[in-house]
């Protein structure tokens, strides 16, 4: 397979210096929606730049339960969103197959729930175009042995699991392949205006404080809940509803199918398998805007998630909790609902020229991870209409990088080639692009992260080609540090490789401390039993043996 650098001008996602060139479109936000919008714009021939204040997936995209929604959860309360979800579900299975696992899903009815609700649920699913098969409890237990054996009813739906980190990275790569420029760690601090038109953005480099300006004909605000602040900088207002959702990650994959509670949407009503773990969630609590960058999972939320999660699968009662985390849903407020659950998950695409008299500014928000591609299509359609460009959207047909047809698939089916465990793991993460991971020596085959089977060769590939500048970036691209030991044994190895590549943007000892503190931040709310033992050993290893606290006493979690 030819080297990446020979197939295009540059796949390396580089920072840019001050520029006076004008783009057709500036996309603000490096989550799935922003990455998808940059991809769509670039594929339609627009001169595109994407700007992200931190790293890709640092916001809500990297803080969800990784559900490939069938839309069934919304069939009763939000049929429009349900129909969007099932349509996008089928598209993502085609274009993002290396990001998707077809687990199937169960909606279970427990003795305290109502079978009448199940009957209505099935009818609502069918109306939305979602396949919903009623199963007897025995069949449900046969399909998913981890499900609560006390269930009195079950419905099978086409749910699945999707990795938001891989999905976003693939969209970024596709955008770059089609000519887009990418800027990370660049925060929008203001806009350049010409009367009632936005014609550029003012940026501050979060690493060195350097300021710059990027000019564009149209700017797309794809910042999720942070879009509220970006809109205010532009002089307009969006009434966003910050709804916090807390989740727990368990150290083992106890279930192979997604398990949902068949009742009206409530806290802790879903258990999603993913890679080597499973995730239970979520809660829904309105929080102030000043907390969206500093969310904490409370003991009460942990207790609730564990208590209700055990009702989905009793095996969770004896399974170690790895960590807790929370994300913020980018909902557009429409009423005074105290939980935000009645607010539509539908897509909101705002043309601020029509709404506020501000030309050259578009906001795409609402929706969810499942509908990111459709959101990007709607935003790009609007941008193209403003620029007089008449090119159709092709993102539903053209596979993402890593999901293209691969000759190795057939060879493996015919047992012509066999892969090692780490090669299979890398293929699961990078799809057909795992062929770009070059192992030139036995040293390249050595494992950096034993929990997730991440090799030196894969780390080298990620550092060189996937815009990695610190350990947190590396975690999002490879799953290094996301396994049972939470970076205990692999973080120092990864830091050494970053230093060797001269890609670490801060002293490697500080980067290592920041990474371990970021891991600690998620472990602290569930720090008892086996997790407490693990934390104590990690602390002894890094502080007592490596002297990390002496070298970097002020280190805090940082991007």
Which ranges hold each PLM region?
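Glycine-rich FAD pyrophosphate-binding loop
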Residues: 42-62
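Dinucleotide-binding Rossmann-like beta1-alpha1 core, especially the glycine-rich loop
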Residues: 66-143, 269, 410-419, 534, ...
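Flavin (FAD/FMN) cofactor-binding and adjacent substrate-gating region
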Residues: 5, 108-178, 183-184, 190-197, ...
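N-terminal Rossmann-like FAD-binding beta1-loop-alpha1 element of flavoenzymes
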Residues: 25-49
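Core beta-strand elements of the Rossmann-like FAD/NAD(P) dinucleotide-binding domain
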Residues: 21-23, 209-218
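C-terminal catalytic lobe of FAD-dependent flavoproteins
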Residues: 164, 174, 239-246, 252-254, ...
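Extreme N-terminal leader/targeting segments of oxidoreductases
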Residues: 1-25, 40-44
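Flavin (primarily FAD) binding-site architecture
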Residues: 221-235
């Amino acid at each position: 397979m030819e080297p990446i650098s020979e197939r295009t001008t540059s796949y390396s996602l580089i920072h840019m210096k001050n520029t006076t060139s004008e783009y057709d479109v500036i996309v603000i936000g490096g989550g799935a929606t922003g990455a998808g919008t940059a991809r769509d714009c670039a594929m339609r021939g627009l001169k595109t730049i994407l700007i992200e204040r931190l790293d890709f997936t640092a916001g809500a995209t990297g803080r969800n339960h990784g559900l490939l929604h069938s839309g069934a959860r919304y069939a009763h309360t939000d049929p429009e969103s349900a129909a969007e979800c099932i349509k996008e579900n089928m598209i993502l299975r085609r274009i993002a197959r290396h990001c998707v696992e077809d687990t199937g899903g169960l909606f279970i009815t427990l003795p305290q729930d109502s079978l009448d609700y199940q009957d209505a649920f099935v009818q609502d699913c069918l109306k939305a175009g979602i396949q919903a098969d009623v199963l007897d409890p025995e069949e449900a237990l046969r399909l998913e042995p981890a499900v609560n054996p006390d269930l009195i009813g079950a419905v099978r739906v086409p749910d699945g699991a999707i990795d938001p980190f891989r999905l976003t990275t693939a969209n970024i790569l596709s955008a770059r392949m089609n000519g887009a420029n990418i800027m990370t760690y660049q925060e929008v601090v203001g806009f350049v205006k010409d009367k009632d038109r936005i014609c550029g953005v003012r940026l501050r480099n979060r690493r060195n404080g350097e300021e710059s300006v990027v000019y564009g004909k149209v700017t797309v605000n794809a910042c999720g809940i942070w879009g509220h602040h970006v809109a205010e900088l532009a002089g307009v207002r969006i009434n966003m509803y910050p709804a916090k959702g807390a989740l727990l990650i368990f150290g083992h994959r106890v279930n192979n199918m997604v398990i949902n509670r068949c009742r009206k949407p409530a806290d802790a009503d879903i258990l999603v398998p993913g890679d080597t773990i499973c995730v239970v969630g979520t809660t829904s609590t309105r929080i102030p805007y000043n907390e969206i960058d500093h969310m904490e999972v409370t003991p009460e939320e942990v207790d609730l998630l564990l208590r209700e999660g055990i009702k989905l699968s009793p095996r969770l009662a004896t399974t170690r909790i790895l960590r807790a985390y929370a994300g913020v849903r980018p909902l557009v407020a429409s009423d005074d609902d105290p939980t935000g659950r009645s607010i539509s998950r539908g897509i909101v695409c705002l043309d601020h020229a029509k709404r506020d008299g501000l030309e050259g500014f578009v906001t795409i928000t609402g929706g969810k991870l499942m509908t990111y591609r459709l959101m990007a299509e709607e935003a790009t359609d609007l941008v193209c209409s403003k620029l007089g460009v008449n090119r159709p959207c092709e993102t539903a047909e053209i596979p993402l990088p890593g999901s293209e047809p691969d000759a190795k698939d057939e060879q493996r089916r015919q047992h012509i080639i066999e892969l090692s465990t780490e090669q299979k793991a890398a293929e699961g993460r990078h799809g057909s692009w795992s062929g770009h991971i070059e192992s030139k020596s036995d040293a390249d085959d050595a494992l950096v992260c034993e929990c997730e089977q991440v090799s030196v060769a894969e780390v080298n590939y990620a550092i060189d080609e996937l815009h990695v500048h610190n350990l947190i970036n590396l975690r999002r691209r490879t799953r290094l540090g996301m396994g049972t030991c939470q970076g205990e044994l692999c973080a120092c190895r990864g830091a050494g490789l970053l230093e060797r590549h001269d890609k670490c943007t801060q002293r490697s000892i500080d980067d290592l401390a920041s990474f371990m503190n970021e891991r600690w931040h998620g472990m602290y709310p569930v720090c008892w039993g086996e997790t407490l033992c693990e934390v104590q050993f990690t602390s002894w290893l890094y502080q007592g043996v490596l002297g990390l606290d002496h070298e970097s006493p002020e280190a805090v979690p940082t991007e």
